[in-house]
């Protein structure tokens, strides 16, 4: 039976003792906040329907929005998938551990709640020492979407998890800020050509050797994502100073995310991001900071849609759509 989470989750530095506690909680059916290289995840035992149901309750997540299952090692794939295609084996060898999720046919005994009722499951091996140690110690596949309320900016710091889900999570392991800052790339790897379902930390360019091709959408893409409690406005870099000045003249509290040379003085919240990689790393934290500082509108300088810039612009458009 799952254990009841405390009224408020605890945050612990990710020591070996804390990791052991987190593993015990996972095995007991509780929810654990887990650092990964992309964003923090809300972890539960992927083989326990009751534990996984707790993720959907905590996040307010639609039941047909499938979860990504995390493994300690590629050798564990057989625990959650029915068949590993040659393409999946090739991509896993090249990109795991790392921010690439492979969609494959789900094993028959994997709970349908984990897959959102779909016949497939997304799987990856994270490239974070705390996540890997937790998975190895727990010795169970872990379902782990981003550890935030659905629709909110994803968490890249342990305190973000507590802010959104503190009453639902038993423990948050603090592994420091997420290194990448945007979610994994999701690829359907069942066929002979990879189909990109979601842009992410591994770029299309990095998948070119495997002939990546565009696809309409991942199952959960129709839902609201990444939106803070303030307006997000996207502008070309050269237009940012004038846009900020015009908005400020109306009396609104204005924030901005842009290269430092474009950030004017007097902003209610300012985040300098000099390139797309830096913007990916800082984006969700910057949106949350703007929100907590009472910003009415945050103006963001767009970036070129190449490399990780595609994933960044995807997240920004969704945030701006509210």
Residue ranges and their predicted role:
Residues 1-322:
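Active-site-adjacent structural elements in enzyme catalytic cores
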